Amino acid sequence: MSITFGELVGNFILVTGSVIVLLLLIKKFAWGAIESILQTRSQQISRDIDQAEQSRLSAQQLEAKSQANLDASRSQASKIISDAKEIGQLQGDKLVAEATDEAKRLKEKALTDIEQSKSDAISAVKTEMSDLTVLLAKKIMGANLDKTAQSQLIDSYLDDLGEA
C-alpha cells in the first residue's frame, strides 16, 4: 500500500484543519477555565512562597532571640559563679582572719596568764622569804648563839627554803 502525494497533502490539510478547529473550540469554551486554574495555581504558589519566606524570617528572628537569651543566660551563670567564688573567697579570708585574731588573743591571754602566774609565784616566794627571814631573825634574836649554832640555824633555814 503506497500513499500518493495528493493523499498525503489531503491528510495534512485535514489534520491541520482539525487541530485549528480544536484549538478554536478549546479557546472559546475551555481556555478561560484553564487560564483561571493556572492563574489560581500561580497565586497559590506565590502565596506559599511568601509564607515560606515569612516563616524563614520568623525562624531567623526566633533563632536570633533564642541565641541572645542563651548568651544572656550564659553570662548570668558566669556572673553567678564568679560572684559565688568571690563570696566564698571573702568568707574564707574572713574566717582565716578571725581564726588568726583568736589565736593571737589566746596567745596574748596565755602570755598574760603566764606573767601573772610568774608574778604571783615571785610574790609568794618573796612573802615566804620574808616570813622565813623574820622567823630566822626571831630565832637568832631569841637565842644568843655562838658561831656553830648560828651556822646550824642558817643551814636549817636553807634546808627549809629548799623544801619550800
UniProtKB/Swiss-Prot annotation:
Topology with respect to the bilayer: Single-pass membrane protein
Disulfide bonds: none
InterPro entries per record: ATP_synth_B-like_membr_sf, ATP_synth_b/b'su_bac/chlpt, ATP_synth_F0_bsu_bac, ATP_synthase_B_chain
Record-annotated membrane-spanning stretches: 6-26
Cellular compartments per GO CC: plasma membrane; proton-transporting ATP synthase complex
Pfam family, one: ATP-synt_B
Localization of this protein: Cell membrane
Main location: membrane
Keywords of the record: ATP synthesis, Cell membrane, CF(0), Hydrogen ion transport, Ion transport, Membrane, Transmembrane, Transmembrane helix, Transport
Single GO term (MF): proton-transporting ATPase activity, rotational mechanism
Function of the protein: F(1)F(0) ATP synthase produces ATP from ADP in the presence of a proton or sodium gradient. F-type ATPases consist of two structural domains, F(1) containing the extramembraneous catalytic core and F(0) containing the membrane proton channel, linked together by a central stalk and a peripheral stalk. During catalysis, ATP synthesis in the catalytic domain of F(1) is coupled via a rotary mechanism of the central stalk subunits to proton translocation. Component of the F(0) channel, it forms part of the peripheral stalk, linking F(1) to F(0).
Membership in a protein family: Belongs to the ATPase B chain family.
Subunit and partners: F-type ATPases have 2 components, F(1) - the catalytic core - and F(0) - the membrane proton channel. F(1) has five subunits: alpha(3), beta(3), gamma(1), delta(1), epsilon(1). F(0) has three main subunits: a(1), b(2) and c(10-14). The alpha and beta chains form an alternating ring which encloses part of the gamma chain. F(1) is attached to F(0) by a central stalk formed by the gamma and epsilon chains, while a peripheral stalk is formed by the delta and b chains.
UniProt protein name: ATP synthase subunit b
Native source species: Streptococcus pyogenes serotype M3 (strain ATCC BAA-595 / MGAS315)
